C-alpha cells in the first residue's frame, strides 16, 4: 500500500468515527453541539452497572488511607473504548474511591464523587473513570487541542510513578470528552509538569445527566519501567472541577510536605510486565515554497517549490532505556514564538523549547540553572539521544551536528546528564556539555548538583559548575558557578533563601545563563490565611522579598550591593476561580564611574558622561494583576504597572543612563464560542517617559489574535495574527538633555530605532496521534514604515509548506 496509502487509510477510518490504524476510538460527536448531543446517554447506565458489581469489586477508599492496591490483573479484557464502562471486564478492576479535596480547602471530603476502576493486562493498563456531578450543566468540556484544556475544562489526571522513586511520574489527563493531555511530573522543577512530551495511548469520554465518564488505555510499550519480575508503581488520581476551581485526589495530599509524589498510593506486585521491544519509525516528507524581498532590487519573488525527506526513530533498548534519533528534522508545524518586548531589555530573552525531538526526556536535564538549553542547537542536520533509568540512576545523552552557518564551522554538540536517587526523595546529579566547532572553538561545562529533602518539608538545592571556553592555541577562559537555596513547604508559612555566585568568565554556550560576573542573595517569606470551605475568600496573605546583586569582587570584598529590590506583595483568591495580587517594590542601582568608560556627552568639547548616582536610588514600582480562570464562555487575565525604571545604555554594557516612568498593561482574553471554536485575544503595551521632561523614550505595543476550530479531536484549523510596533529613542543626559555618545574607534549617538512588523499564520492540521500528521500551512512576514500603518505594509517574506508523516510502531 505504501506510506501514502497508510496515511489515507488512517485518515478515512478516523473521519468515519471508528478505530484507526492506532486503534483509537473517539465519540462520534463533533462540532458546536458536541456536549449537548451526548447529554443523557451514558452516566445513568454506567451507574446501574456500578451498583450491581459493587459487592464483587475490591474498593480502596483513599480517605481511609487504603492506598495499596494489589495488581488488578485481567489477561484478555474485551473492552471497547467508548466512555460507557458497561463491559463485564470492568468488574475485575480495583475501584478507587473516597477522594479528598486538597485545594482550596485541604482534607475535607470531595464535593463530588469520583470512582476510578483500574485493570492491568499483558499489554496495557486501563482506567475507567466515573466523575459524578450534581450540576451536570456546569461540566466544562470542549474539543480542545491536545494539552490545551487545563485552564478551561474539567479533567481527571492519572499519575504513574513507574519506578516508584517519588521523583518522576507520567501524567495522563483527560477532559469529559476524552481529549488527551500528557506529560511528565518532575519533583522540584520550576513548572512541576512538563507538558511537552506526547505518548501513544487511547481515551474516550462522554457527558451525561449525572456527570461524565472516561475510559483510558495506556499501552505498556508507551511507558518506561524497571526490568524486574515483580515491581510496584506509584499511583495518584486527581480531579479538577473548573467552574469552582476545586481539586481533589484519591491519595490525600497536603501542602505541608515538599514532595507530592511521595504522598501517592501504590499499585503493588505487578508481574509479567513485558512491553516488547519498542520500535517507532517516523518518516517525514515536506514540501515548501518560499518568497522574499530582494535587498538590492526591492522586488519580491518566490523560489521554486522544494521538497525534503527526514526520519525519526525511537528504539526501546530495554524496558527502561530508549534511543531516539533524527535525520534532517523538520519543525515547520511548530508555532512561532510570541513576540516579546525588547526596547529596554538588558539581557538575552529566554524562549521555551517547542521542537518535538528535543522534548522527550527533557525532565532528566532539569537543574537549578539551565546549563542545558536545547534551543542553542539551532538547525540540526542530525541528532541522537539515549535516555532512561538504570536502577536508581537516570541518564540522558544528546549528540547533534548543528548547521549553524557560522564562520567557525558547524558545531558538534554533546550533552550528558546523570542523576542518581538518594534516600526517599533526594537526588544528586552531574552534567557535562561540549560544543566544538570544527576545531576552531570550543566550550565545555562540567557541573554537579543535588536536591536534598529534609524532614519532608525542607528542600536544599545546591549546584556547582566550571566552564572552559576558547580556541586552540589560545589561552582558555575559565569560569565558575555556584548556587545554594533552601525552601520550606507549607500551606501557611513559606520561606525561601538563596545564594548564587557566577564569575565573569563563566560561559555555557549550550545553556542559558542570563547574568555573569555577579553575586546574588535573596530571601522571601510569605504567610497565607485560608477560608472555610465555601467561603467567599478562599485564601489571602502577604509576602516580603529582598534581593541584592553585587559585582562579584565587590561582594567578596565586603562592599555594598550594586542593585537591591525590596518588595511587598499581597495576593488573594476568591470563590469561583477569581484572584489577583498587588505588589509594591523599591529598587536601587549603584554603578561605579568606571562602568561608564567610553560614554561622552555630545558637545564641542566631548566630556565624559557620568550621571549622578542618587538618580537611581529608591525607584518605586506598583504592579497589579487579576484573573478569572473560567467564567461561563470566557477566561480573562489583566495586568497593569506604574513604576520608575532606569533607561539602560545597552552599548555601555547595560549601565543605567537615565530614569523613566514606566506605564505598562496587558490583557489576555479567551472566548469559548462553542465546544469546538475558541478565540484568543491579547494586548501588551509599555511606554517609558523620561522623568526629566516627560518626553517619550520608548514604546511597544503588541496585539495578538488567534482563532482555532476543532472539527474533531484530530482535525483542526488555526489562524494567528500578531502585530509588533516597537520604538526606542536616543540616550540623553538626564540633567541637560544632551545626547550621549558611545565612543570606541569613533563616536556615535544612540539615536534610537523602530520596527513595525505584522505576522500572519494559517495552519490546517490532521493529527490522529503523535507523529502521524498532515499539515498545510502558510505564513507571511510584513512591515510598515510607521506604527500601525496597515495601509503601507509590504511583504518581506512568506512561505507555504506541506508536511506529512506517519508513525509506524513495530
Please identify what each model-predicted range represents:
Residues 2-16:
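Bacterial N-terminal signal peptides
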Residues 22-421, 427-429, 440, 804:
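Structural preference for beta-rich elements and adjacent junctions enriched in aromatics
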Residues 74, 109, 120, 151, ...:
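Surface-exposed coil/turn segments at beta-strand junctions on protein surfaces, enriched
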Residues 112-114, 201, 309-311, 382, ...:
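Residue-level marker for the onset of beta-strands and adjacent loop->beta junctions
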Residues 123-125, 168, 212, 229-233, ...:
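Outer-envelope beta-barrel architecture signal
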Residues 274-324, 413-469, 539-546, 635-639, ...:
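Surface-exposed extracellular loop regions of Gram-negative outer-membrane beta-barrel proteins
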Residues 300-304, 322, 329-562, 567, ...:
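Catalytic-domain carbohydrate-binding cleft regions of carbohydrate-active enzymes
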Residues 379, 465-810:
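Exposed, low-structure sequence patches enriched in small/polar residues
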Amino acid at each position: 500500500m505504501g506510506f501514502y496509502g497508510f496515511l489515507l487509510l488512517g485518515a478515512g477510518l478516523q473521519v468515519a468515527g471508528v478505530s484507526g490504524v492506532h486503534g483509537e476510538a473517539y465519540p462520534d460527536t463533533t462540532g458546536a453541539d458536541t456536549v449537548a448531543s451526548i447529554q443523557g446517554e451514558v452516566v445513568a447506565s454506567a451507574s446501574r452497572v456500578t451498583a450491581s458489581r459493587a459487592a464483587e469489586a475490591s474498593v480502596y477508599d483513599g480517605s481511609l488511607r487504603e492506598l495499596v492496591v494489589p495488581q488488578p490483573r485481567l489477561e484478555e479484557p474485551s473492552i471497547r473504548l467508548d466512555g460507557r464502562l458497561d463491559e463485564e471486564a470492568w468488574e475485575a478492576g480495583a475501584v478507587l474511591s473516597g477522594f479528598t479535596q486538597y485545594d482550596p480547602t485541604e482534607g475535607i471530603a470531595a464535593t463530588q464523587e469520583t470512582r476510578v476502576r483500574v485493570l492491568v493486562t499483558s499489554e496495557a493498563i486501563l482506567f475507567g473513570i466515573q466523575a459524578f456531578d450534581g450540576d451536570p450543566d456546569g461540566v466544562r468540556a470542549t474539543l480542545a487541542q491536545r494539552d490545551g484544556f487545563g485552564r478551561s475544562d474539567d479533567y481527571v489526571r492519572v499519575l504513574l510513578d513507574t519506578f516508584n522513586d517519588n521523583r518522576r511520574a507520567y501524567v495522563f489527563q483527560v477532559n469529559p470528552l476524552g481529549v488527551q493531555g500528557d506529560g511528565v511530573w518532575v519533583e522540584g522543577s520550576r513548572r512541576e509538569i512538563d507538558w511537552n512530551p506526547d505518548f501513544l495511548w487511547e481515551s474516550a469520554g462522554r457527558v451525561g445527566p449525572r456527570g461524565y465518564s472516561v475510559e483510558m488505555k495506556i499501552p505498556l510499550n508507551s511507558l518506561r519501567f524497571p526490568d524486574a519480575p515483580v515491581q510496584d508503581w506509584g499511583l495518584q488520581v486527581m480531579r479538577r472541577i473548573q467552574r469552582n476551581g476545586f481539586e481533589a485526589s484519591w491519595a490525600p495530599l497536603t501542602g505541608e510536605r515538599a514532595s507530592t509524589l511521595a504522598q501517592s498510593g501504590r499499585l503493588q506486585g505487578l508481574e509479567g510486565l513485558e512491553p516488547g521491544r519498542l520500535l517507532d519509525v517516523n518518516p517525514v516528507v515536506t514540501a515548501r515554497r518560499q518568497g522574499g524581498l530582494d535587498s538590492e532590487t526591492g522586488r519580491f519573488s518566490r523560489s521554486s517549490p522544494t521538497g525534503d525527506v527526514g526520519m525519526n526513530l525511537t528504539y526501546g533498548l530495554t524496558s527502561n532505556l530508549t534511543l531516539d534519533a533524527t535525520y534532517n528534522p523538520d519543525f515547520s508545524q511548530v508555532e512561532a514564538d510570541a513576540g516579546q518586548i525588547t526596547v529596554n531589555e538588558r539581557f538575552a530573552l529566554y524562549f521555551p523549547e517547542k521542537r518535538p525531538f528535543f522534548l522527550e526526556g527533557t525532565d532528566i536535564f532539569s537543574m537549578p540553572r539551565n546549563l542545558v538549553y536545547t534551543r542553542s542547537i539551532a538547525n540540526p542536520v542530525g541528532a541522537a539521544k539515549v535516555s532512561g533509568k538504570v536502577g536508581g540512576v537516570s541518564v540522558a545523552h544528546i549528540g547533534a551536528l548543528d548547521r549553524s552557518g557560522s564562520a567557525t564551522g558547524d558545531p558538534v554538540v554533546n550533552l550528558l546528564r546523570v542523576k542518581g536517587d538518594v534516600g526517599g526523595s533526594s537526588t544528586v546529579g552531574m552534567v557535562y556539555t561540549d560544543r566544538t566547532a570544527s576545531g576552531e572553538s570550543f566550550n565545555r561545562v562540567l557541573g554537579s548538583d543535588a536536591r536534598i529533602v529534609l524532614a519532608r518539608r525542607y528542600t536544599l538545592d545546591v549546584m556547582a559548575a566550571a566552564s572552559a571556553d576558547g580556541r586552540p592555541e589560545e589561552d582558555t577562559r575559565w569560569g565558575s558557578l555556584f548556587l545554594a537555596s533552601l525552601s520550606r513547604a507549607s500551606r501557611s508559612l513559606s520561606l525561601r533563601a538563596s545564594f548564587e555566585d557566577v564569575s565573569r568568565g563563566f560561559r555555557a554556550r549550550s545553556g542559558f545563563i542570563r547574568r555573569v560576573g555577579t553575586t546574588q542573595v535573596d530571601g522571601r517569606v510569605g504567610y497565607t490565611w485560608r477560608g472555610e470551605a465555601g467561603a467567599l475568600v478562599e485564601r489571602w496573605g502577604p509576602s516580603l522579598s529582598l534581593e541584592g546583586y553585587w559585582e562579584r569582587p565587590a561582594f567578596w570584598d565586603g562592599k555594598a550591593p550594586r542593585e537591591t529590590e525590596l518588595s511587598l506583595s499581597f495576593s488573594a483568591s476568591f470563590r469561583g476561580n477569581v484572584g489577583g495580587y498587588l505588589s509594591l517594590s523599591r529598587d536601587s542601582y549603584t554603578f561605579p564611574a568606571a562602568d561608564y568608560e567610553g560614554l561622552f556627552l555630545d558637545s564641542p568639547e566631548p566630556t565624559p558622561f557620568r550621571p549622578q548616582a542618587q538618580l537611581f536610588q529608591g525607584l518605586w514600582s506598583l504592579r497589579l494583576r487579576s484573573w478569572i480562570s473560567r467564567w461561563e464562555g470566557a477566561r480573562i487575565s489583566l495586568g497593569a504597572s506604574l513604576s520608575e525604571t532606569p533607561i539602560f545604555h545597552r552599548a555601555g554594557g547595560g549601565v543605567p543612563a537615565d530614569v523613566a516612568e514606566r506605564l505598562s498593561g496587558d490583557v489576555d482574553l479567551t472566548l469559548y464560542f462553542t465546544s469546538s471554536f475558541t478565540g484568543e485575544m491579547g494586548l501588551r503595551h509599555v511606554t517609558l517617559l523620561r522623568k526629566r521632561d516627560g518626553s517619550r523614550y520608548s514604546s511597544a505595543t503588541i496585539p495578538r489574535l488567534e482563532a482555532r476550530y476543532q472539527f474533531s479531536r484530530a482535525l483542526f484549523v488555526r489562524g494567528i495574527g500578531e502585530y509588533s510596533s516597537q520604538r526606542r529613542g536616543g540616550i540623553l543626559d538626564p540633567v541637560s538633555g544632551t545626547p550621549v555618545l558611545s565612543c570606541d574607534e569613533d563616536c556615535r549617538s544612540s539615536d534610537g530605532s523602530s520596527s513595525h512588523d505584522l505576522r500572519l499564520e494559517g495552519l490546517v492540521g490532521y493529527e490522529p496521534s503523535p507523529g502521524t500528521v498532515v499539515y498545510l500551512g502558510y505564513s507571511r512576514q510584513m512591515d510598515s514604515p510607521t506604527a500601525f500603518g496597515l495601509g503601507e505594509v509590504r511583504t518581506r517574506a512568506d512561505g507555504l509548506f506541506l508536511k506529512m508523516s506517519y508513525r509506524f510502531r513495530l
